[in-house]
């Protein structure tokens, strides 16, 4: 681990890594926790997996469609930061603008600064990454099916997040670009 110059390592914050499936969020998150002291990964997918076991919830194709998922993501992040402090790195795709607004405003109300980054890659690289992923091979078709949703969401995502192009960029370099963005935003009071 190394300290980021200019980042208050005592402050709490969230670094939210958005982007379509295959953009490099999880890999970048792992690199970021090596760069930033007191950083840990919080994966909101786990909240969704928990909710799948609750009887009576309506059937949905994506657990983000459950309002409790969005509220629990905010509450869990808030509780974690209250308990352990530091920085939460959140590698989570959110493609519905209303859902992002709910999560972001909830975190804002809790007094948690959010640094939102969109990891973007070109179409060929994206499809190659999805098709050659050996970790979650069962999710391959689901990820490919959601690429059009990502392209639809790009207009609002590009307004809401700082875009980092991951095409042909090694994960460690992407993580350094995100860390530099956090450092610049923190220094600028954003």
Predicted regions, residues:
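N-terminal amphipathic/basic-hydrophobic helices that include classical n-h-c signal peptides
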Residues: 1-12
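Hydrophobic anchor at the beta1->P-loop junction of P-loop NTPases
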Residues: 17
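The conserved Walker
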Residues: 21
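Conserved glycine(s) of the Walker
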Residues: 24
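Conserved substrate/cofactor phosphate-moiety recognition/catalytic segment
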Residues: 27-75
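Glycine-rich phosphate-binding loop used to anchor ATP phosphates in small-molecule kinases
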Residues: 65-116
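Conserved phosphate-donor/acceptor-positioning beta-strand/loop module used by diverse small-molecule
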Residues: 108-130
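Small-molecule kinase domains that catalyze NTP-dependent phosphoryl transfer to phosphate-bearing small molecules
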Residues: 132-177, 185, 189
